């Protein structure tokens, strides 16, 4: 993808079009991935400016460690020899290796990136496997209940799923004591409701482990087995291992970026726009995907494929993943399917009424995590809003719709005259003069926070685009939404500072969005 160089700042640049975008997302594609049941036819890092203008850090929801980051379980390193799988996976193409959960494999070649050649000691077959599905045999990393280096916050998000029974648990590394571990357990009582307890697992000089010194174990496996039978001081005995999503593979399979059209089956239309459609479908009869199509003649193929090139370069657990593409017309872009659709639809739907502030703040933290990565990679999204965030299982949120994203040089990208963008979400310097930076994305994030706290209300209610721009230029900012803490509104207002350089970084924003009130710390 060719990067767009920044233009000189010129106050005389004419104002941009105030035409609102279509109700669909950029390029006329629908933002939602919520099925409407239409049947298918058969057929180098750039340093960010540090945010140092705030004298004291915000404590939005209690004093909590601001070094936390949202991460997923990281279990596999550069392994060799015998490994054990911690998930079941069916082969997707002929060169793949199918395996069952806790199957032993021998690694044959681990020098080809994220796809390794392995031999099954059970079936005798050989093929490629995703490296993040395995761990050294007989190691703690191979245990289903071991989640490694995830944070307190992430463990809380996973365990607070209402479908988890009392006693659902996981073991993770301690964030405060090197070499120690933490047992996180879901609990419920009428006073507190669903909550999480965290118990520090200490290590003996002799190599054993204990939670209370009166009961000691030679291994973590023995500790887990004991507390699965006896509560013995815990809030509840251990019942179920905390469920988590399958590890995300890089691409659909090894060397499967360009795929044949016939390998895709379009099944349910999720929406359509002027330039094309989005479908839920299946690849190779094995893998659920979302497929973006382009109507021939409505847009240059090069412009459409530009989104795929951006997504291929930007890879992070909080960004929707590009899987593959069909680059001959009609062009298809194959991306990760997110089962709950757009965040906007999710907030306004049946599930939205059950979301409470801690969950909304956690969702905001996930979005900030994804955008902090975009920030580090020196890109600008340009269309950050709830309609362009997708939601999956367990309230996982990922930034999507990179059709307007650009690599920025000299910290600024200037849009072409006449470019259209969502005015109510766009920073004044971008809406009026087309000057986009990561700081204009920060402004948009502040607007997105209002969407979260109001369960999807349109920003600046009762105002048209021209009125919004005029009043914002004269200093107007939206008031604190109902039931929103003043400290969170203060964070929004930091995002809406007139001088872009005085707005916070996404890294800072992520650190401030710490829903400590949802975690009942017992360690």
UniProtKB/Swiss-Prot annotation:
The keyword Repressor does not apply. Residues 264-514 form the Protein kinase domain. Its EC number is 2.7.10.2. Signal peptide: none annotated. Residues 71-139 form the SH3 domain. It catalyses: L-tyrosyl-[protein] + ATP = O-phospho-L-tyrosyl-[protein] + ADP + H(+). ATP binds at residues 270-278, 292. Residues 145-242 form the SH2 domain. A lipid is attached at residue 2 (N-myristoyl glycine). One of its GO terms (molecular function) is ATP binding. The active site is at 383 (proton acceptor). Residues 7-25 have a biased composition (Basic and acidic residues). Residues 1-50 are annotated as: Disordered. Homodimer. This phosphoprotein, required for both the initiation and the maintenance of neoplastic transformation, is a protein kinase that catalyzes the phosphorylation of tyrosine residues in vitro. This is Tyrosine-protein kinase transforming protein Src. It comes from Rous sarcoma virus (strain PA101T).
